[in-house]
């Protein structure tokens, strides 16, 4: 990759891409004034302060002062209709499995952050809105 092969280059990429390509990440200063490297753990600390609106959009709290929080994170969304539907049972089951079983076991090993704590509870509350009919 260009960044790996050109000393001093800067880019933004998912942690999994950096790990796959052997590219070093920079420690970033967070609102607590501490320089923190990206990891599933430091991202989880940051995301725990995020809010989820009624429509499911995540707002990161850029004033959160957790000392071990890495402040540069992207959020992936699972999208579904919440309207009553018999087929929503499978969709709801998939999202619940992904958040509560698959991600905790596999996300960190793939360079991603499983949701934990209050942000996981908020995500589970969004899944609960899927009306299975």
For each predicted feature, which ranges?
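Extracellular/periplasmic juxtamembrane helices and adjacent flexible linkers that interface
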Residues: 62-133
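Ligand-binding pocket segment of bilobal, Venus flytrap-like solute-binding proteins
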Residues: 1-50
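Cyclophilin-type peptidyl-prolyl cis-trans isomerase
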Residues: 1, 47-68
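Generic preference for hydrophobic/aromatic residues in regular secondary structure cores
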Residues: 10, 23-28, 54-61, 73, ...
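Phosphate-binding glycine-rich loops and adjacent basic patches that engage nucleotide phosphates
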Residues: 39-41, 52-62, 84-90
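Generic detector of leucine side chains in alpha-helical contexts
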Residues: 10, 15-18, 37, 47, ...
């Amino acid at each position: 990759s260009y960044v790996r092969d050109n000393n001093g280059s800067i880019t933004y990429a998912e942690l999994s891409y950096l790990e796959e390509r052997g590219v070093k990440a920079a420690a970033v200063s967070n609102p607590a004034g501490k320089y923190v490297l990206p990891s599933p753990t430091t991202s989880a600390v940051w995301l725990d302060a995020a809010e989820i609106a009624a429509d499911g959009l995540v707002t990161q709290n850029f004033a959160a002062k957790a000392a071990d929080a890495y402040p540069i994170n992207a959020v992936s969304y699972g999208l579904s209709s919440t309207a009553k539907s018999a087929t929503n049972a499978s969709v709801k089951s998939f999202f619940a499995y992904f958040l509560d079983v698959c991600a905790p076991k596999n996300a960190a090993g793939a360079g991603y952050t499983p949701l934990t704590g209050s942000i996981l509870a908020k995500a589970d509350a969004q899944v609960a809105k899927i009306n299975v009919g």
